[in-house]
Amino acid sequence: MTVTIYDVAREARVSMATVSRVVNGNQNVKAETKNKVNEVIKRLNYRPNAVARGLASKKTTTVGVIIPDISNIYYSQLARGLEDIAIMYKYHSIISNSDNDPEKEKEIFNNLLSKQVDGIIFLGGTITEEMKELINQSSVPVVVSGTNGKDAHIASVNIDFTEAAKEITGKLIEKGAKSFALVGGEHSKKAQEDVLAGLTEVLNKNSLQLGDTLNCSGAESYKEGVKAFAKMKGNLPDAILCISDEEAIGIMHSAMDAGIKVPEELQIISFNNTRLVEMVRPQLSSVIQPLYDIGAVGMRLLTKYMNDEKIEEPNVVLPHRIEYRGTTK
């Protein structure tokens, strides 16, 4: 049978209001009474309901997390950083997978609000205009981390994809690349746009032109990388920039199966740097996004909003670095 606040109050011979004050950390309780109530709570194994506690404290110490797919290695690293900081600040997380479905995202968002969460963090994927409107109208703070399609009015944490693309393109040109292609997916359109901006800026400065810009029809997966290579096979560039590691590996394996030498004849670089990049041969060159930190900093930013702390910068840009491994010269 579930132990209730009434059971604790009866056993400790105090009012339910006193038990509530002890549970919520109210200082206006005598030490002797507090110790007695805590002893009964421990003995009866009473677990306060977060929403019930929230009625007294106006907080549930619960945050909602909207994530495209936690089984994806990219998103799981973001989620781990978030969760560690949430625990550090005594918050519990309700994690919901949206599957990059805009309708499902809206449903999850409204469901989390109905659960009286103290804040919501949106991890990865792309924010639609409709979702931006929901966020701007939200009754609780919302932070987006590692998410494409950011808005200046929405608190966010990410890297600068445009600057990363400019660095990569310049380096590959130095190594002899004269023709380039960009491969991304429909769920990373904004990141792809930012990469494209940096790529074309450097190409224009060097009087070079961009070849293919391919949007994969589905998620940024190995299979989509294989399909992308098939489309480019008759007119391969010197270098391919891929938004995801899985796409890049699909392209690399397809190229090698076709007898094309990587990186001598085709250079490949990605923007995720998940654990996969070191599990393939040659190892994949990649932009190192501090995925754990992006999740962690996003959660810390959310705790500041939830606790009315001073916010120095609502749109945080974390540093990146580029690891040139075996798929580039």
Curated annotation (Swiss-Prot):
Key words, A-Z: Activator, DNA-binding, Repressor, Transcription, Transcription regulation
GO MF term (any one): DNA-binding transcription factor activity
One Pfam short name: LacI
SS bond list: none
UniProt keyword annotation of Repressor present: yes
Positions of the HTH lacI-type domain: 1-57
Record InterPro entries: CcpA (IPR006377), HTH_LacI (IPR000843), LacI/GalR-like_sensor (IPR046335), Lambda_DNA-bd_dom_sf (IPR010982), Peripla_BP_I (IPR028082)
Portion annotated as DNA-binding: 5-24
NCBIfam families from the UniProt entry: ccpA
Reported function: Global transcriptional regulator of carbon catabolite repression (CCR) and carbon catabolite activation (CCA), which ensures optimal energy usage under diverse conditions.
Name of the protein this chain belongs to: Catabolite control protein A
Organism: Staphylococcus aureus (strain MRSA252)
Lineage: Bacteria, Bacillati, Bacillota, Bacilli, Bacillales
